């Protein structure tokens, strides 16, 4: 992937290293079940890697469930004895999380052909647009790649910490292996994030090419419009491939944060264990940050697509002697006006800042409802 190799600067090197790490980790865990055909320069699906990933994560899920049940039999949290409602909510959250991770891992296998099409389209674009676009370093691309990986590393550390803290007779190596399902969950989310940020980078390069070019031929405008159309179709394919997984993931983030805050209130206020605020704050911050990054990257790509219309307007407002050039510009502007980068879940809910704020407010209101409902037990 020469186009995405570091060109200059520490952030470029770091972003490239993180993308490589995600790729090799996904291969190692069977979550990216493809091999590279060097002759055709395309990815092809490997049934052995699919089978390996499915068996590995099935065993890890069974191990994690066994470890959780063993810990539950040995010790019951004091907070659960203090507040029975908290125990019920926590158990339902555990079941929901287990179900979500299982579905995401199964969907990763089921939709592997679609993922292959997306990856191959990105590889094809890489080879075809070198002479068409003005290649530059995209600051937001590097920034969001680094931020997402830092958030994922934080999630990994928290998962390992909680697995090691489980009170059962399992050796530490088995406790660490119990983290594989949550690691797989983060890598699957990382795939979606990477696909969206790569689409954003191409759209950003289209805008930069238009802004930097004082004299554009009709053939180049037509080629840019064709590229823009391919990026629109690619973004639709990415969302169609990941909409169910993204819905489940967003639900898990919000439920998890609500349960955790309620847990902190019971421990900190009812049981007067104020130190728990300091211990649990990093996890809460990382959860909200990770949730918000998935919202922002979709909103960023959508706004970048809207920016293309504004850049084209600068060209269409000018008078052109070349009728073919004017026709190409009008067709490109028409495409940008009637088809936009909108990342919608199941074709209904747009992923943007407004949706993110609404979900956070809904989660907060649900927490208030819990406190009012169970006020006498606090």
UniProtKB/Swiss-Prot annotation:
Glycosylated residues in this chain: 207
Cytoplasmic compartment spans: 1-13, 70-88, 165-178, 267-354
Keyword flag Mitochondrion: no
GO biological process: monoatomic ion transmembrane transport; sensory perception of taste; signal transduction
Highest taxon in the source lineage: Eukaryota
Tissue: Taste bristles in the foreleg and labial palps.
Main subcellular location of this protein, as a coarse class: membrane
Lipid bilayer topology: Multi-pass membrane protein
Any one GO MF annotation of this record: ligand-gated monoatomic ion channel activity
Transmembrane segments: 14-34, 49-69, 89-109, 144-164, 179-199, 246-266, 355-375
Family statement drawn from the similarity comment of this UniProt entry: Belongs to the insect chemoreceptor superfamily. Gustatory receptor (GR) family. Gr22e subfamily.
Protein name: Putative gustatory receptor 22f
Taxonomy of the source species: Eukaryota, Metazoa, Ecdysozoa, Arthropoda, Hexapoda
Gene assigned in the entry: Gr22f
């Amino acid at each position: 992937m020469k186009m995405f190799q570091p060109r200059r600067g520490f952030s470029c090197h770091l972003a490239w290293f993180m993308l490589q790490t995600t790729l090799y980790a996904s291969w190692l865990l069977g979550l990216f079940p493809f091999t590279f055909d060097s002759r055709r320069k395309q990815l092809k699906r490997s049934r052995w890697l699919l089978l390996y990933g499915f068996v590995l994560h099935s065993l890890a899920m069974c191990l994690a469930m066994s470890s959780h049940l063993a810990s539950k039999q040995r010790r019951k949290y004091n907070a659960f004895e203090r507040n029975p409602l908290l125990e019920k909510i926590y158990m339902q959250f555990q079941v929901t999380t287990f179900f979500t991770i299982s579905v995401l891992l199964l969907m990763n296998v089921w939709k592997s052909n679609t993922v292959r099409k997306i990856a191959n389209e990105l590889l094809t674009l890489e080879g075809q647009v070198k002479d068409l676009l003005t290649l530059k370093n995209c600051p937001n691309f590097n920034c969001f790649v680094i931020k997402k990986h830092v958030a994922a590393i934080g999630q990994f550390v928290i998962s390992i910490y909680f697995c090691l803290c489980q009170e059962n007779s399992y050796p530490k190596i088995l406790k660490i292996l119990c983290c594989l399902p949550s690691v797989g969950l983060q890598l699957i989310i990382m795939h979606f994030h990477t696909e969206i940020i790569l689409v954003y980078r191409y759209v950003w390069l289209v805008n930069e090419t238009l802004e930097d070019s004082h004299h554009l031929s009709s053939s180049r405008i037509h080629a840019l419009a064709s590229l823009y159309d391919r990026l629109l179709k690619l973004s639709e394919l990415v969302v169609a491939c990941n909409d169910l997984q993204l819905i489940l993931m967003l639900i898990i983030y919000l439920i998890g944060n609500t349960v955790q805050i309620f847990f902190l209130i019971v421990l900190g206020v009812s049981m007067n264990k104020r130190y728990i605020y300091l211990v649990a704050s990093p996890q809460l911050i990382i959860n909200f940050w990770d949730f918000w990054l998935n919202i922002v990257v979709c909103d960023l790509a959508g706004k970048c697509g809207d920016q293309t219309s504004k850049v084209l307007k600068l060209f269409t407002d000018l008078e052109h002697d070349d009728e073919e050039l004017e026709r190409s510009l009008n067709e490109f502007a028409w495409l940008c006006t009637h088809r936009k980068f909108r990342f919608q879940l199941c074709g209904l809910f747009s992923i943007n800042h407004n949706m993110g704020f609404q979900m956070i407010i809904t989660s907060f209101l649900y927490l208030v409802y819990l406190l009012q409902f169970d006020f006498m037990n606090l």
